């Protein structure tokens, strides 16, 4: 229907211009005719003049746009024989117009109203799609924060958020808050990985990188499974491939160091399958108090009393301190 109305507007000056002299008075109509020469009516306009007046008398409350839609639909279903007299009349009017105005050239006026209306609708559609009723705004911002430290632009981050389904506004406020916390942890991880180091950087990264991704992947598990608490087995099976594929391949300079780190990590996980990674990462070396509290908030409490876990936790900080002492003599994560 909208395309038919556009065709009508393209072929003719519009039905409103014909009724202007009757509505505003003869003086203003004559002034308008003196200033601007109207285009000759096409066949549809010749036919719709009488039909529009008739339909307006039958339905006085009907809007003009609805009348135009109905007239356009009627004109399309009419046969060529029914259209023929109106086509001939339009040709006669065009010939008369060419005689009266031989130097006439059609100069289309700027349709500022239609352009503004289209821009308004497109803007509203974009806001509805991006905001999703107000809930999806913060996940979209999280997508930007996740992508911006890596050097991507705003358009890429918007596409990233849409691809992952964050911007449809169907998630609850708790998931949005979880995503915001995950973005903070991702920023901390990226800032730490860009910290300058020496040749033993891959050992250092291997022992300290799991501090950051663990809460982020825990949020991912809750978002995917729609459950408040994810069990440790599914978490353990999902986390090595998750951050092993992302953090190591993105932040290590050597592929040999990458494969060695992943191999060590997989053997570490396979050797003790009953111990979840969050417990081991909780006591790995010195880290800031707020980060430790943030991680320990999501740890299962029942496994911390296991004696094998305690002996392993006592051995890990010594190994961590011996490996991190060679990296420029600095304590990691103090700049976050």
UniProtKB/Swiss-Prot annotation:
Record GO terms (molecular function): DNA-binding transcription activator activity, RNA polymerase II-specific; RNA polymerase II cis-regulatory region sequence-specific DNA binding
Location within or outside the cell: Nucleus
Motif placement: 9aaTAD: 293-301
InterPro entries: HMG_box_dom (IPR009071), HMG_box_dom_sf (IPR036910), SOX_fam (IPR022097), SRY-related_HMG-box_TF-like (IPR050140)
Alphabetically ordered keywords of this record: Activator, Developmental protein, DNA-binding, Nucleus, Transcription, Transcription regulation
Location (main, coarse): nucleus
One GO BP: neuron differentiation
Keyword Hydrolase: no
DNA-binding region (UniProt annotation): 37-105
An annotated GO cellular component: transcription regulator complex
Chain positions covered by the region annotation Disordered: 1-39, 193-216
Biased composition (Basic residues): 200-211
Tissue expression profile of the protein: First detected at the tail bud stage in the forebrain. At the 3-somite stage, also expressed weakly in the hindbrain. At the 12-somite stage, strongly expressed in the forebrain and weakly expressed throughout the central nervous system. At the 21-somite stage, also expressed in the lens.
Function: Transcriptional activator.
The protein, known as: Transcription factor Sox-1a
Gene this chain is encoded by: sox1a
């Amino acid at each position: 229907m909208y395309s038919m109305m556009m065709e009508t507007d393209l072929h003719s000056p519009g039905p409103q211009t014909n009724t202007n002299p009757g509505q505003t008075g003869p003086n203003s109509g004559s002034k308008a005719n003196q200033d601007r020469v109207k285009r000759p009516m096409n066949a549809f306009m010749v036919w719709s003049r009488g039909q529009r007046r008739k339909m307006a008398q039958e339905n006085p409350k009907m809007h003009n746009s609805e009348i135009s839609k109905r007239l356009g639909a009627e004109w399309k279903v009419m046969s060529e024989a029914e259209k023929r007299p109106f086509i001939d009349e339009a040709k006669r009017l065009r010939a008369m117009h060419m005689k009266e105005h031989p130097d006439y050239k059609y100069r289309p006026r700027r349709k500022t109203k239609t352009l503004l209306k289209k821009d308004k609708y497109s803007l509203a559609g974009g806001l509805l799609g991006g905001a999703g009723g107000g809930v999806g705004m913060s996940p979209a911002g999280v997508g930007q924060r996740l992508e911006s430290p890596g050097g991507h632009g705003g358009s890429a981050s918007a596409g990233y958020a849409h691809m992952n389904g964050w911007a449809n506004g169907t998630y609850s406020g708790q998931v949005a808050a979880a995503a915001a916390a995950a973005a903070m942890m991702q920023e901390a991880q990226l800032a730490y990985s860009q910290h300058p180091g020496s040749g033993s950087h891959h050992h250092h990264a291997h022992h300290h990188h799991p501090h950051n991704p663990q809460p982020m992947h825990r949020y991912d598990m809750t978002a995917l499974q729609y459950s408040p608490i994810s069990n440790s087995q599914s978490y353990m099976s999902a986390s090595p491939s998750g951050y092993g594929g992302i953090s190591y391949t993105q932040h290590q300079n050597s592929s040999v160091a990458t494969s060695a780190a992943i191999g060590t990590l997989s053997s570490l996980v396979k050797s003790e399958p009953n111990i979840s990674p969050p417990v081991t990462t909780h006591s790995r070396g010195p880290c800031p108090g707020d980060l430790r509290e943030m991680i320990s908030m999501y740890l299962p409490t029942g496994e911390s009393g296991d004696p094998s876990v305690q002996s392993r936790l006592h051995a890990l900080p010594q190994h961590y301190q011996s490996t991190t002492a060679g990296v420029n003599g600095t304590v990691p994560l103090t700049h976050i």
